[in-house]
Structures are given as structure tokens and as C-alpha cells.
């Protein structure tokens, strides 16, 4: 079992109950799922780019990705409706907690020139999306075997009612959000 899940149940729930004055444990926000997606624009030219992206995403997540297709044709991007343009994977339960732990403790510290993640990436509904420029920050990817650098989007979906609740939830896990943006910081001291 993932350590972060145990930490959430033993510490985070009670800290958030105290801070937001929830009456029930069920009101405390939690992470529902993590979605990782890769858009592979080069797959229009060569299908091998998409195959390699699928392999990379499968190694990173531990789960087989789903191929995403274009919803409509866009001439300027040279894509047609139904054309395979990327892949995504949705992690829940055990795999979600394991990935979240690896993301916080291993992958994010390996980002070059890292100064914290922006808090402007909250969507207004308590979900957080971050972009990663290089897949090589994950230890599962062998640097010698990659054919190119690919980025990805990681969306952390919570059941928090507001961005402030989601911010406090992610900070409770020591998620490296920038401190200088203090619009979500609590008025109470811990």
C-alpha cells in the first residue's frame, strides 16, 4: 500500500477537518484520479512516434494507455477527424497513490531549474493540471533508449469544492507549489 494514502488517512484528514471546520470525515477533499496525457503531433508523419509515446506512458504509469483521436479536422494542424494524435491513462486507487508518490518524491525534484509549480494551474473547481516538458524525469524511462523528448500533461482531479481546499490538500502532501503566490494560504496558523 502506498505511504501517501496512509499519510492521508492518518494526518491530512484531521488537519483539514480542523482547518476548514468540517463536521464529517466525508466532507474532507480527496484525490479522485490522476490523468496523464501525451499529445504526439509527429504521429501524423510517422506512426512510430505514437507507439514510442504509448510505451513510455505505459512504463511511467504501470497501466496500458488509451489512444486519443482528433474530434474534428483542423487544416492548419494537418489533422483529420478520427486520426490518432496522442494517448492518455487514468489512474485510480492504488496505482494513483503510487504514481503520486513517485511524482512528488522522485520525478519533480529531477526537473531542471525547478522553482516550484504555479498555483495558477487550478481550474476553479479544485483540480490541478501541470505540464512536464521531458519524460526522462521519471526513473522508469531509460535515457539511452529514447528516440526523442516528449512532454505530458498531468491532471490531479479532487473532489474539493474550491481551489483553496485543493491547494491546502496538495500542500498537505508537500506538493511543491510556489510559496510566493499566497492567495490560497490559510489565515490560521497550524
From Swiss-Prot:
One of its GO terms (biological process) is translation. The keyword Isomerase does not apply. One of its GO terms (cellular component) is ribonucleoprotein complex. One of its GO terms (molecular function) is rRNA binding. InterPro entries: Ribosomal_uL5, Ribosomal_uL5_bac-type, Ribosomal_uL5_C, Ribosomal_uL5_CS, Ribosomal_uL5_dom_sf, Ribosomal_uL5_N. Pfam families: Ribosomal_L5 (PF00281), Ribosomal_L5_C (PF00673). Keywords: Ribonucleoprotein, Ribosomal protein, RNA-binding, rRNA-binding, tRNA-binding. This is one of the proteins that bind and probably mediate the attachment of the 5S RNA into the large ribosomal subunit, where it forms part of the central protuberance. In the 70S ribosome it contacts protein S13 of the 30S subunit (bridge B1b), connecting the 2 subunits; this bridge is implicated in subunit movement. Contacts the P site tRNA; the 5S rRNA and some of its associated proteins might help stabilize positioning of ribosome-bound tRNAs. Belongs to the universal ribosomal protein uL5 family. Part of the 50S ribosomal subunit; part of the 5S rRNA/L5/L18/L25 subcomplex. Contacts the 5S rRNA and the P site tRNA. Forms a bridge to the 30S subunit in the 70S ribosome. This is Large ribosomal subunit protein uL5. It comes from Blochmanniella floridana. The gene is rplE.
Amino acid at each position: 500500500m502506498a505511504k501517501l494514502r496512509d499519510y492521508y488517512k492518518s494526518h491530512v484528514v484531521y488537519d483539514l477537518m480542523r482547518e476548514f471546520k468540517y463536521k464529517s470525515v466525508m466532507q474532507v477533499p480527496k484525490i479522485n484520479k490522476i490523468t496523464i496525457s501525451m499529445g504526439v503531433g509527429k504521429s501524423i508523419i510517422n506512426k512510430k512516434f505514437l507507439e514510442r509515446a504509448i510505451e513510455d506512458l505505459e512504463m511511467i504509469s504501470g497501466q496500458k494507455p488509451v489512444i486519443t483521436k482528433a474530434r474534428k479536422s483542423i487544416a492548419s494542424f494537418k489533422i483529420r477527424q478520427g486520426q490518432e494524435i496522442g494517448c492518455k491513462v487514468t489512474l485510480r486507487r492504488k496505482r494513483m497513490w503510487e504514481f503520486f508518490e513517485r511524482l512528488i518524491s522522485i520525478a519533480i525534484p529531477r526537473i531542471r531549474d525547478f522553482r516550484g509549480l504555479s498555483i495558477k494551474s487550478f481550474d476553479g473547481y479544485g483540480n490541478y493540471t501541470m505540464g512536464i516538458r521531458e519524460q526522462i524525469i521519471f526513473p522508469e524511462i531509460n535515457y539511452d533508449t529514447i528516440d526523442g523528448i516528449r512532454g505530458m500533461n498531468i491532471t490531479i482531479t479532487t473532489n474539493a469544492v474550491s481551489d483553496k481546499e485543493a491547494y491546502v490538500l496538495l500542500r498537505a502532501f508537500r506538493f511543491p507549489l510556489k510559496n510566493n503566490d499566497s492567495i490560497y494560504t490559510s489565515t490560521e496558523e497550524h
